[in-house]
């Protein structure tokens, strides 16, 4: 388990006990991701360990919470794939107040166009910020 997956689980308020990770309760707990009401904007990048080089550096994004998760994690990778309907990696999901508002999925190349994706994400974050004043 890397530091990003631990952060994701801690942020969701989930216990990291191995026996609980395989229970049906864990799948319901993953649904908490869609209830991210304490953050206006959340960006989650889902990838596989074998495709790590295709990750996009999201650390420079402002005004949003950023998380990374691996579908290769033996404890909850399958639950992530099912919960978020992940068909290809990397996939980047954007949530606004817990509702998925944007999805970016890689094609056959297993890569995303970094410049285009970052521009679209930043534009969406700007829109979220503007909606606060409407």
Could you tell me what each predicted segment is?
Residues 1-10:
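Bacterial N-terminal signal peptides that target proteins for export
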Residues 9-19:
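Bacterial N-terminal signal peptides
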Residues 21-23:
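Boundary at the C-terminal end of the N-terminal hydrophobic targeting segment
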Residues 26-65:
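Local sequence-structure signature of Cys/Sec-based thiol-disulfide redox active-site neighborhoods
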Residues 64-73:
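A short beta-strand-loop structural module common to alpha/beta enzyme folds
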Residues 73-80:
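N-terminal post-signal-peptidase region of extra-cytosolic proteins
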Residues 83-95:
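Structural micro-motif
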Residues 94-134:
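Non-catalytic, surface beta->alpha helical segment in thiol-disulfide oxidoreductase systems
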């Amino acid at each position: 388990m890397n530091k990003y997956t631990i952060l994701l689980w801690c942020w969701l308020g989930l216990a990291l006990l191995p026996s609980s990770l395989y229970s049906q309760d864990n799948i319901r707990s993953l649904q908490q991701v869609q209830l991210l009401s304490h953050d206006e904007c959340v960006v989650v990048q889902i990838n596989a360990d074998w495709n790590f080089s295709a990750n996009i550096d999201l650390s420079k994004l402002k005004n949003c919470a950023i998380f990374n998760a691996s579908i290769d994690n033996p404890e909850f990778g399958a639950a992530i794939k099912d919960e978020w309907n992940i068909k290809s990696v990397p996939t980047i999901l954007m949530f606004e107040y817990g509702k998925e508002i944007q999805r970016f999925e890689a094609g056959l190349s297993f890569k995303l166009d970094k410049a285009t994706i970052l521009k679209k994400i930043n534009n969406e974050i700007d829109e979220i910020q503007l909606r606060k004043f409407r």
